[in-house]
Structure formats: C-alpha cells, structure tokens
Amino acid sequence: SNIPVIIFGGRTPISEHSHFGCRNTPIGYGQEMRDQAALVRESVKWDFELRYADQAGEHVDRAWAIANSLPKGPVYLSLPREPLCETFATDSAALNCRPSQQPISFSPAPDSLSMAATLIANARHPVIFSQRGARTRQAFDLISTFVEQWAIPVVEYWGTEVTISAAHPMY
C-alpha cells in the first residue's frame, strides 16, 4: 500500500567457530532456515543480509532510500547473530552521517505536461480520478488550488492516500 517500512529479521549464527556469536548451542542448527529472506522476498522491494556490523549505517541508509522511493514499500534486512555481537566505534562516520542516499521521485516529461494541460483546457467536463494521492504537502496544496481555479471535481476511487481535503468544494 505504498508504505515505507524497514523490516529487520534476526538469524541464527552463520559461522561454526572463530567468531563471537557463532553457533555455540545445538538449537541453532534446528532453527536455521536455508533462505529466511525467501519468506518476504516476494512482498518487499529489496532484501539484504548484514555481514559486518560496521556496515549497518550504510545498509540502513540504503534500505531507507529504497523504501521511500516511489512506489514506496517495505524492504527487509536480515541480521545474523555475528554482526549483532560485533563491537565497533559508535563515532564512525558511516553511523553518524545524514542520509547519503535519497529516495527517487519521478516527474513527467515536460511535453507530457503540456499535452495534459491542453486536454484539460479543451475538455467540456473534466474530472480527476485519483487513488494514490498527492504524495507531498506541496503537491496537495497545488492540486487543491488547481482544481478550485479550474472547477474540476476530484473523485478518490479506492483511495490509498488523500489527494485533496474531503472538505474541499471540488471533492
């Protein structure tokens, strides 16, 4: 439903010895799934398994950007026990930086906008049918102003996000 979510899933250890967090009890063998991410792979936009603790910041950054790119949706990060047991410097630049990867947003080609404007201007009774909403506050305000100035009704059929206010005269 276009909702950005980061899902974290813990895993049993991936190593047999020599690493803090390795398998040290028999229960780890019985509970291990060969491909845990397969449970969610068909329902998420991206999945990844963290292998080293000091990469947590960059992978969460990437997960956030992908989850928030249109169409927004869930992503999955698998966390084996070893990286969760590792120690690393918490003042690491990778952990304490602003997001480096930004969500992607799409814009129509300028000639497509021109064509749409011509169709709307020449329509006898234009109506806007919407489902996915305005997406941003700026778009919400622009659409609200546009439909009021042009007296174009907006119908939200099976809406998942709001396009204009339900109190708007053109709603």
Feature annotation, model-predicted:
Residues S1-Y171:
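N-terminal alpha/beta PP-like core and its mobile active-site loop of ThDP/TPP-dependent enzymes
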